[in-house]
């Protein structure tokens, strides 16, 4: 088991919906600090108390203050760990999940493997594809644009994944 660090802001009202927020890479729960209170207590910001969420924002395994896995794990295993956090540790019957960047990949696996407990996901990064690939000309054109976009914007990921110390010298 991995020790998990997370923010757990109980929402206002009688029945707030549990919402799991997952950060990206290289990121942290700091990405969510400005929205947690707004999601948990919408009535303080002109919203309706009935729209409140119990917000759970974990540091992903190996990130921030969460424990480090003893061996490398991928997004599917992280999805299982986070589902366990929500269902077994925090004792929610069901929840919603949101993820961006690496968190989106994990959210996809939560939605795929844990749909009994996770009722919906929201992602802001496309990571999973249909196993048979593009089906139409429009999808093929989108895939080509997406692949080109990845080439043009992927340098940071390659640099950080293969030579992370290099970037630290520029920060000194």
What positions do the PLM features span?
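Catalytic cores of eukaryotic secretory-pathway lumenal/extracellular enzymes that build
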Residues: 1-172
């Amino acid at each position: 088991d991995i020790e998990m660090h997370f923010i757990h802001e109980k929402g206002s009202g009688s029945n707030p919906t549990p919402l799991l927020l997952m950060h990206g890479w290289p990121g942290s729960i700091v990405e969510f600090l400005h929205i947690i209170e707004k999601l948990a207590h919408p009535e303080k910001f002109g919203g309706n108390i009935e729209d409140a969420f119990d917000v759970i924002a974990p540091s992903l395994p190996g990130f921030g203050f969460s424990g480090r896995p003893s061996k490398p794990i991928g997004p599917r295993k992280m999805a299982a760990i986070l589902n366990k956090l929500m269902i077994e540790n925090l004792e929610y019957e069901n929840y919603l999940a949101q993820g961006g960047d690496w968190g989106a990949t994990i959210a996809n696996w939560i939605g795929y493997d844990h749909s009994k407990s996770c009722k919906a996901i929201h992602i802001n990064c496309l990571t999973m594809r249909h196993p048979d690939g593009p089906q139409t000309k429009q999808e093929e054109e989108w895939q080509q644009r997406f692949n080109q976009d990845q080439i043009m914007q992927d340098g940071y990921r390659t640099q950080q994944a293969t030579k992370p110390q290099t970037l630290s010298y520029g920060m000194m």
